[in-house]
Amino acid sequence: MLCVIGDLVEDIVVWLPESLNYGADTPSQIVRTRGGSASNVAVFAARIATRENLNSIGARLIAQVGDDRLGEQLIEVLQIAGVDPCVVRSGRTGSIVVIVSPDGERTMLTDRATSTQLLSAPDNWFDDVSLLHVPAYSLFSESLATATQACIATAHEKNIPVTIDASSASLIEAYGVSEFRQVIAKIQPQVLFCNTDEAKTIRLTTDPINVPLVVIKAGASPTTLITRDGSTTVEVAPVSQIIDTTGAGDAFAAGFLNSYQNVYIGVDTITDISLRDCVLAGHQLAARVLRSPGATMDTQ
């Protein structure tokens, strides 16, 4: 199964029908959902994997969540979705306020609390794992970053492929571009996901990283696939009635990786045709999230 390591928090999504009235009331629509990039990927992947078997476990999440009622609720949501929550309970559960302006622009106020304080993960949490996915958010904050590197080392020891999502151009810049490139080189992921801003920040087009597959998303524009044999692009089907972009990138990763692990685990040859199918699966799942509030697939 797919295993993801990272954050499990509450998302508080605020839609503004008009500009924010500073110092006064602003009528808004507010929705509270489970959030965190890692938990998003795990839930979306589980929804795919458990579609035909409602009693199965579709994905695993390694995370730390608060020893509080909110933490209990988030774990319950994971279990209902078909995720195996391998979590440490300690401290206070984190929350992220996502403010969506009338033009769709998102501003996030983050309080990750205990979600960045994971110290370690036992080896048996990797039993039955076929692929480990790591959002780069998990590499930027201690002690989660050290725990994540230890999990990656365990994955390598068990011959479990690792994939990385670049997550955030601004956080990469704050972390240090050269330092981030060195981390990627050390991790040796099978796949690196990024959007155009992240690809530009990492200098992927001018100074390629030695990764078997780089996937560059560009919203509604074609997705670029870069392998050691060259590059190709895949057209993106238009999406109507977009409600919220929160979690769409995580949904793409989940859809892509579900197809990828079914085709490529244990296989040495990567073909453009099969990779295109992975991209299409990613965008198909992302479209469902784009039509739903927050990082959910409530609208089918």
Predicted regions and their residues:
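Conserved phosphate-binding/catalytic region of the ribokinase-like
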Residues: 1-3, 204-300
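Ribokinase/PfkB-type carbohydrate-kinase core domain
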Residues: 1-8, 75-88, 100-232, 265, ...
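Glycine-rich phosphate/adenosyl-contacting loop at the front of the ribokinase-like
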Residues: 1-60, 73-76, 96, 242
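Beta-strand->loop->alpha-helix junctions that form or flank phosphate-binding loops
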Residues: 31, 62-67, 82-94, 212-218, ...
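A general structural signal for well-ordered alpha-helical segments in protein cores
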Residues: 38-42, 71, 148, 164, ...
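Short, conserved phosphate/pyrophosphate- and ester-handling motifs at nucleotide-, phospho-/glycolipid
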Residues: 45, 195, 249
